Amino acid sequence: MEELKKEDIKCIFPKRDENSNKGDFGYVGIMGGCIEYSGAVKLANLSSSALTSGAGVVRLIVPKEIANGVMPYLLEQTLFTIESKDGHMLFNKKEIDKALEKLKALAIGMGWGESEDNEKILRYILENKEMPIVIDADGLNMLAKMDKSILNKTKCKVILTPHPKEFERISGYDFQDILNNPQELASDFAKKYNVILLLKGHTTTITDGKTTYLVKKGCSGMATAGSGDVLSGILVGILGYNESTVLSVSAGSYLAGLAGELAEKELNDISMKASDTISVSYTHLRAHETSAH
């Protein structure tokens, strides 16, 4: 168990070859959104493509009924719509297969809402796909309703990103015990279910039950709606061109925390929003990442 430093993550962001193309850096998908919470999936989408996570192509997968509200936020990204009812996705195997075609990694759950069809979609992906999948927000709520043995059976490399209350729901651990022993319980759960667990907190714990990193980047200004959505976008972008390792996931957490710190310096901890971390420029962020402490 060790605190992650900037020197540890330089290998995650290598210098790119002049002859590389977008396919070299992965097609990634962001699946989420519903009529009530379209903003969450917009944040995840923007962070994956506009921050420094570096995916080659970002595909936003949303319910058909909210597509018009999402389209103005798309510049370089592509859009795939899923048939929906009352603003929520409907489960259809052929549509899901088409939506996930060619993807190197997927983030799911941001602003998704809770429904029987969403649970079916998540279960189908876990049982039938083979890709890194970042599960956040309502994706975690869907997972909490399932038999956790599905995590041991899946061919996906699962990355879970709960805050302590969400971790209580998916693990069954006592909330106070989680607050008192976050590293130990996170490691135990990750090892038992063969996942990478990113447990959010003042000190964020990232572990697969064997290797554990602690990330102490971040600020109080990030304690606001949407910060988790931004993190999920960053993570899936990184996983588009890196192996699904504890270090890769930790690098995403470090990057999100650093972006938050820089945004807080430009604004303040009271008025900053999650979207402000996205507006931190690529050049500014990378300059801080590679400079000395």
Label the model's feature ranges:
Residues 1-132, 141-159, 164-286:
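Small-residue (G/A/S/T)-rich helix-start motifs and N-terminal tracts that mark the onset
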Residues 287-293:
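A short, hydrophobic C-terminal helix/tail in secreted or cell-surface proteins
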